[in-house]
């Protein structure tokens, strides 16, 4: 039997899932906000990544992205962290051609599915990255360069001992604030009430942010946010859904 060819998509998956070690060979443990799941990368998803990465994919680099060059315009760039399978992200890109969208997802099946849907919808204002979002924010995105951040249904890490793994922490918000332009927004949504309260607390601590909620907590579900599979799951389980929308002063 001939050996299966290792494609670009396979190598990308291997790179993302490789553990990190110090120079003397000891495991370098990092507190991450995501779990590297082992879902199968389908042949279709693999082909979509291999065939369309040049059009949709960006790589981690040690200098800032030139968004005007990448997108061919100076429209606002909206960053979404953890787009899952990418359907809602592609829908937003399709519905808002006056905006550019940049999605980050560490799970290669989701990246492949997102690219496939983007090809189907023929969107031109979307790029995706398969890498740790904290490193992308730090290394690749210039200060005052983002029009907004979207974080929809992040991993809730529901056990108290794992709350430190939740991505929404004061230092994360501080990092995002540096990257946002004035009047840029932070839009979060979750179906875990405890996490919603934490999001509200962390965002409210920043004096540079204004809560757009009339009740100074959560906003009604906005029509412009597409219904995601996580939200549908939450409805089936009887969960509420909480949206937060803050703007940089």
From Swiss-Prot:
Substrate binds at residues 159, 191, 228-231. The active site is at 155. Its EC number is 2.1.1.33. The keyword S-adenosyl-L-methionine applies. It holds the Pfam family Methyltransf_4. It is an enzyme of class 2 (transferase). Coiled coil: none annotated. It catalyses: guanosine(46) in tRNA + S-adenosyl-L-methionine = N(7)-methylguanosine(46) in tRNA + S-adenosyl-L-homocysteine. Keywords: Methyltransferase, S-adenosyl-L-methionine, Transferase, tRNA processing. Belongs to the class I-like SAM-binding methyltransferase superfamily. TrmB family. This is tRNA (guanine-N(7)-)-methyltransferase. The gene is trmB.
């Amino acid at each position: 039997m001939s050996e299966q060819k290792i494609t670009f998509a396979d190598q990308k998956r291997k790179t993302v899932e490789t553990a990190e070690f110090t120079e003397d060979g000891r495991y370098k443990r990092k507190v991450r906000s995501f779990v590297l799941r082992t879902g199968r990368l389908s042949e279709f998803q693999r082909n979509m990544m291999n065939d369309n990465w040049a059009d949709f994919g960006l790589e981690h680099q040690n200098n800032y992205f030139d968004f005007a060059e990448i997108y061919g315009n100076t429209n606002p760039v909206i960053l979404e962290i953890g787009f899952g399978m990418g359907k809602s992200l592609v829908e937003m890109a399709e519905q808002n051609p006056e905006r550019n969208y940049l999605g980050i997802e560490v799970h290669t099946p989701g990246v492949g599915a997102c690219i496939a849907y983007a090809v189907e919808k023929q969107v031109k204002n979307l790029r995706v990255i398969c890498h740790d979002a904290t490193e992308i924010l730090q290394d690749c995105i210039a200060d005052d360069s983002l029009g907004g951040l979207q974080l929809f249904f992040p991993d809730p890490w529901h056990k108290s001992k794992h709350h430190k793994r939740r991505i929404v922490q004061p230092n994360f918000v501080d990092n995002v604030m540096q990257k946002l332009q004035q009047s840029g927004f932070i839009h979060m949504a979750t179906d875990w009430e405890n996490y919603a309260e934490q999001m509200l607390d962390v965002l409210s601590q920043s004096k540079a942010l204004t809560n757009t909620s009339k009740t100074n907590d959560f906003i009604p579900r906005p029509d412009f946010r597409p219904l995601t599979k996580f939200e549908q799951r939450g409805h089936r389980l009887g969960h509420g859904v909480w949206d937060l929308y803050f703007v940089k002063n």
